Amino acid sequence: MAIRTIITEPNKLLRQVSKPVTKVGKEEQKLMKDMLETMYAANGIGLAAIQVGIPQRIIVMDICKEENKKEPRYFVNPIIKNKDPLKATYEEGCLSVPNQFADIDRPSKCEVEYLDYNGQKQLLKAEGLLATCIQHEMDHLEGILFIDYLSKLKRSMIIKKLSKLKLSTAEV
């Protein structure tokens, strides 16, 4: 396993729509393991392949809050089948939008169909933080970031801040 570099906004790659995976093989499994290791190293709870520069429809997550316990989840070619009309608000952040957080409203429940780590078709009924995390990561597959749900002013302020941060770290 290897820790990969996480791409941060502003970056055109993050706005790209990811392509479906044709089959889950050793290469895809290695990518998923690398993504998980990268996510854990960055103290995240979810990561999409596009965030490490791979435009494939793969996401990994682990929302387990118990210390020293891991419950990794792998989603290949996920498709949301149903969304609850009832909304829930969570404070969201993103490894590709470092140190920025905002309250985002999303459907409180969703049903997602996907291929698991072994390429087996699965159906998951998710609610709460899991549903929010799935929808957040699936947005990445469409080139959407959580800041896109904010007002134009807030979004442009965040992007300006991140651009300055990138410039200052590039100069070091």
Model regions: which residues?
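Positively charged
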Residues: 1-172
